[in-house]
Regions:
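Conserved beta-strand elements of the Class I
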Residues: 7-9
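Class I SAM-dependent methyltransferase "Motif I" SAM/SAH-binding loop
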Residues: 11-15
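Glycine-rich SAM-binding Motif I of class I
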Residues: 16-20
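A short, Lys/Arg-enriched amphipathic alpha-helix followed by its capping loop at the start of a domain
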Residues: 21-28, 46
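Conserved acidic E/D residue at the C-terminus of a beta-strand in Rossmann-like folds
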Residues: 31-37, 137-141
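Conserved short alpha-helix immediately C-terminal to the canonical SAM/SAH-binding motif I
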Residues: 38-42, 118
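S-adenosyl-L-methionine
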Residues: 41-86
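Class I S-adenosyl-L-methionine
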Residues: 77-91, 103-230
Length: 230
Protein backbone atom coordinates (compact mmCIF):
# COMPACT_ATOMS: atom_id res chain seq x y z
CA UNK A 1 0.00 0.00 0.00
CA UNK A 2 1.40 3.42 -0.92
CA UNK A 3 2.08 5.68 2.03
CA UNK A 4 -0.30 8.55 2.65
CA UNK A 5 -3.44 6.91 1.30
CA UNK A 6 -6.64 6.91 3.32
CA UNK A 7 -7.46 3.25 3.95
CA UNK A 8 -10.52 1.63 5.47
CA UNK A 9 -12.07 -1.60 6.73
CA UNK A 10 -15.86 -1.89 6.52
CA UNK A 11 -17.57 -4.21 9.02
CA UNK A 12 -21.23 -5.28 8.78
CA UNK A 13 -20.86 -3.97 5.25
CA UNK A 14 -24.21 -5.08 3.82
CA UNK A 15 -24.35 -4.59 0.06
CA UNK A 16 -21.66 -1.90 0.22
CA UNK A 17 -23.35 1.47 0.71
CA UNK A 18 -20.73 2.82 3.10
CA UNK A 19 -17.95 1.23 1.06
CA UNK A 20 -19.18 3.03 -2.05
CA UNK A 21 -19.35 6.36 -0.24
CA UNK A 22 -15.80 5.97 1.05
CA UNK A 23 -14.59 5.01 -2.43
CA UNK A 24 -16.26 8.05 -3.98
CA UNK A 25 -14.58 10.22 -1.34
CA UNK A 26 -11.16 8.89 -2.35
CA UNK A 27 -10.60 6.20 0.27
CA UNK A 28 -9.00 2.83 -0.53
CA UNK A 29 -10.72 -0.19 0.99
CA UNK A 30 -8.72 -3.06 2.46
CA UNK A 31 -11.56 -5.53 2.99
CA UNK A 32 -15.21 -5.77 4.05
CA UNK A 33 -16.95 -8.22 6.37
CA UNK A 34 -20.58 -9.21 5.73
CA UNK A 35 -22.29 -12.45 6.74
CA UNK A 36 -25.31 -12.43 4.40
CA UNK A 37 -24.41 -14.25 1.14
CA UNK A 38 -26.70 -12.19 -1.10
CA UNK A 39 -25.54 -8.89 0.37
CA UNK A 40 -21.89 -9.89 0.05
CA UNK A 41 -22.43 -11.04 -3.53
CA UNK A 42 -23.84 -7.60 -4.35
CA UNK A 43 -20.89 -5.88 -2.68
CA UNK A 44 -18.40 -8.08 -4.49
CA UNK A 45 -20.05 -7.63 -7.89
CA UNK A 46 -20.08 -3.85 -7.60
CA UNK A 47 -17.01 -2.99 -5.55
CA UNK A 48 -14.36 -5.73 -5.60
CA UNK A 49 -11.92 -6.24 -8.46
CA UNK A 50 -10.84 -4.33 -11.53
CA UNK A 51 -13.82 -5.66 -13.48
CA UNK A 52 -16.29 -4.22 -10.95
CA UNK A 53 -17.97 -0.88 -11.71
CA UNK A 54 -16.13 0.57 -8.70
CA UNK A 55 -12.77 -0.88 -7.70
CA UNK A 56 -13.21 0.07 -4.05
CA UNK A 57 -10.96 -2.65 -2.59
CA UNK A 58 -7.61 -2.64 -4.41
CA UNK A 59 -5.65 -3.96 -1.41
CA UNK A 60 -7.77 -6.92 -0.27
CA UNK A 61 -5.33 -9.16 1.70
CA UNK A 62 -4.87 -12.82 0.80
CA UNK A 63 -5.65 -13.98 4.35
CA UNK A 64 -9.25 -12.72 4.08
CA UNK A 65 -11.23 -14.86 1.66
CA UNK A 66 -13.60 -12.99 -0.64
CA UNK A 67 -16.65 -14.67 0.82
CA UNK A 68 -19.35 -14.00 3.43
CA UNK A 69 -17.99 -13.98 6.98
CA UNK A 70 -19.75 -13.98 10.32
CA UNK A 71 -17.85 -11.50 12.50
CA UNK A 72 -17.86 -13.78 15.56
CA UNK A 73 -16.48 -16.68 13.53
CA UNK A 74 -14.01 -14.41 11.75
CA UNK A 75 -12.54 -13.12 15.00
CA UNK A 76 -12.37 -16.60 16.52
CA UNK A 77 -9.67 -17.66 14.06
CA UNK A 78 -6.09 -16.99 15.25
CA UNK A 79 -4.86 -16.35 11.70
CA UNK A 80 -7.40 -13.57 11.29
CA UNK A 81 -6.45 -11.95 14.57
CA UNK A 82 -2.78 -12.15 13.58
CA UNK A 83 -3.61 -10.66 10.20
CA UNK A 84 -5.45 -7.76 11.82
CA UNK A 85 -2.51 -7.04 14.11
CA UNK A 86 -0.29 -7.06 11.03
CA UNK A 87 -2.30 -4.15 9.60
CA UNK A 88 -1.33 -1.78 12.40
CA UNK A 89 -0.11 1.56 11.02
CA UNK A 90 -1.67 0.66 7.65
CA UNK A 91 -5.33 1.41 8.45
CA UNK A 92 -6.80 4.88 8.72
CA UNK A 93 -10.39 3.91 9.49
CA UNK A 94 -12.38 1.00 10.87
CA UNK A 95 -16.07 1.66 10.23
CA UNK A 96 -19.33 -0.21 10.37
CA UNK A 97 -23.04 -0.22 10.98
CA UNK A 98 -23.85 -3.15 13.29
CA UNK A 99 -27.39 -4.60 13.16
CA UNK A 100 -29.79 -1.99 14.51
CA UNK A 101 -32.98 -3.94 15.27
CA UNK A 102 -32.38 -4.05 19.02
CA UNK A 103 -31.90 -0.27 19.16
CA UNK A 104 -34.56 0.86 16.70
CA UNK A 105 -37.60 2.76 17.94
CA UNK A 106 -39.32 1.57 14.77
CA UNK A 107 -38.82 -2.07 15.71
CA UNK A 108 -38.83 -4.24 18.79
CA UNK A 109 -36.20 -2.14 20.65
CA UNK A 110 -34.97 -4.84 22.94
CA UNK A 111 -32.01 -4.37 25.25
CA UNK A 112 -31.59 -8.14 25.41
CA UNK A 113 -31.41 -8.58 21.62
CA UNK A 114 -28.43 -10.88 21.04
CA UNK A 115 -27.33 -8.74 18.09
CA UNK A 116 -26.66 -5.76 20.34
CA UNK A 117 -23.29 -7.22 21.32
CA UNK A 118 -22.00 -6.95 17.77
CA UNK A 119 -20.91 -3.34 18.22
CA UNK A 120 -18.32 -4.72 20.64
CA UNK A 121 -16.91 -6.86 17.83
CA UNK A 122 -16.16 -3.65 15.95
CA UNK A 123 -14.37 -2.39 19.06
CA UNK A 124 -12.42 -5.66 19.16
CA UNK A 125 -11.21 -5.03 15.62
CA UNK A 126 -10.26 -1.48 16.62
CA UNK A 127 -8.20 -2.87 19.48
CA UNK A 128 -6.38 -5.29 17.17
CA UNK A 129 -5.78 -2.89 14.27
CA UNK A 130 -5.36 0.44 16.12
CA UNK A 131 -6.66 2.60 13.24
CA UNK A 132 -6.40 6.37 13.44
CA UNK A 133 -10.19 6.68 13.40
CA UNK A 134 -13.16 4.46 14.26
CA UNK A 135 -16.71 5.15 13.14
CA UNK A 136 -20.00 3.47 14.06
CA UNK A 137 -23.23 4.28 12.20
CA UNK A 138 -26.58 3.22 13.61
CA UNK A 139 -30.15 4.25 14.32
CA UNK A 140 -30.85 7.19 16.62
CA UNK A 141 -32.08 4.79 19.30
CA UNK A 142 -28.52 3.73 20.09
CA UNK A 143 -28.09 7.13 21.78
CA UNK A 144 -30.98 6.51 24.21
CA UNK A 145 -30.99 4.39 27.38
CA UNK A 146 -33.26 1.36 27.19
CA UNK A 147 -34.94 2.38 30.45
CA UNK A 148 -35.46 5.95 31.55
CA UNK A 149 -35.62 4.97 35.23
CA UNK A 150 -34.17 1.50 35.74
CA UNK A 151 -34.50 0.03 39.21
CA UNK A 152 -30.76 -0.36 39.61
CA UNK A 153 -30.03 3.27 38.78
CA UNK A 154 -29.36 5.23 35.62
CA UNK A 155 -27.90 3.37 32.68
CA UNK A 156 -26.02 5.01 29.85
CA UNK A 157 -27.05 4.58 26.25
CA UNK A 158 -25.13 2.08 24.15
CA UNK A 159 -23.59 5.03 22.29
CA UNK A 160 -22.23 6.41 25.58
CA UNK A 161 -20.92 2.95 26.48
CA UNK A 162 -19.14 2.73 23.12
CA UNK A 163 -17.56 6.16 23.66
CA UNK A 164 -16.30 5.02 27.06
CA UNK A 165 -14.96 1.79 25.56
CA UNK A 166 -13.13 3.82 22.91
CA UNK A 167 -11.59 5.96 25.64
CA UNK A 168 -10.45 2.80 27.42
CA UNK A 169 -8.72 1.75 24.19
CA UNK A 170 -6.88 5.07 23.88
CA UNK A 171 -9.31 7.01 21.69
CA UNK A 172 -11.14 10.29 22.09
CA UNK A 173 -14.83 9.63 21.48
CA UNK A 174 -18.05 11.50 20.77
CA UNK A 175 -21.41 10.84 19.16
CA UNK A 176 -24.02 12.93 17.40
CA UNK A 177 -26.95 12.79 15.00
CA UNK A 178 -26.78 13.39 11.25
CA UNK A 179 -29.92 13.81 9.13
CA UNK A 180 -29.43 12.75 5.52
CA UNK A 181 -32.31 14.99 4.40
CA UNK A 182 -30.12 18.00 5.23
CA UNK A 183 -27.72 16.88 2.51
CA UNK A 184 -30.19 16.37 -0.32
CA UNK A 185 -31.51 12.87 0.34
CA UNK A 186 -35.31 12.91 -0.25
CA UNK A 187 -35.97 11.14 3.03
CA UNK A 188 -35.82 12.15 6.69
CA UNK A 189 -33.18 9.70 7.83
CA UNK A 190 -31.62 10.55 11.18
CA UNK A 191 -28.62 8.41 11.99
CA UNK A 192 -26.39 8.22 15.02
CA UNK A 193 -22.68 8.55 14.29
CA UNK A 194 -20.09 7.56 16.89
CA UNK A 195 -16.55 8.73 16.17
CA UNK A 196 -13.32 7.72 17.87
CA UNK A 197 -9.97 9.39 17.16
CA UNK A 198 -6.76 7.79 18.42
CA UNK A 199 -5.20 9.80 21.23
CA UNK A 200 -1.98 10.51 19.32
CA UNK A 201 -3.87 11.97 16.33
CA UNK A 202 -4.10 15.77 16.38
CA UNK A 203 -7.85 15.97 15.88
CA UNK A 204 -11.01 15.80 17.97
CA UNK A 205 -14.02 13.58 17.23
CA UNK A 206 -16.24 16.66 17.48
CA UNK A 207 -14.44 18.00 14.39
CA UNK A 208 -16.36 15.46 12.30
CA UNK A 209 -19.72 16.95 13.22
CA UNK A 210 -18.50 20.53 12.79
CA UNK A 211 -17.18 19.62 9.34
CA UNK A 212 -20.54 18.13 8.35
CA UNK A 213 -22.22 21.40 9.29
CA UNK A 214 -19.61 23.52 7.51
CA UNK A 215 -19.73 21.67 4.17
CA UNK A 216 -23.51 21.40 3.90
CA UNK A 217 -24.10 24.54 1.82
CA UNK A 218 -21.17 23.83 -0.51
CA UNK A 219 -22.37 20.25 -1.00
CA UNK A 220 -25.92 21.29 -1.86
CA UNK A 221 -24.79 23.97 -4.30
CA UNK A 222 -22.35 21.60 -5.98
CA UNK A 223 -25.17 19.18 -6.75
CA UNK A 224 -27.79 21.82 -7.62
CA UNK A 225 -29.94 21.07 -4.59
CA UNK A 226 -32.06 23.59 -2.65
CA UNK A 227 -30.51 24.98 0.52
CA UNK A 228 -33.79 25.79 2.29
CA UNK A 229 -35.41 22.36 2.24
CA UNK A 230 -36.49 20.22 3.88
Amino acid sequence: MPNGELTSIDLFAGCGGLSLGLHQAGWKGLFAIERDPMAFDTLQSNLVGESAPYDAYPYWPDWVSKAPHDIDEFLSRPEHRDGLRGLREAVTLVAGGPPCQGFSAGGARNGADERNHLVHRLLEVVELVRPKVALVENVEGITRPFQSRPRDGARDSVAAEVVQALKDLGYKGAFGIADASQFGVPQVRRRAIIVGVRDDVDAAPEDFFRHLHDIRTEHLRKHGLPEDRP
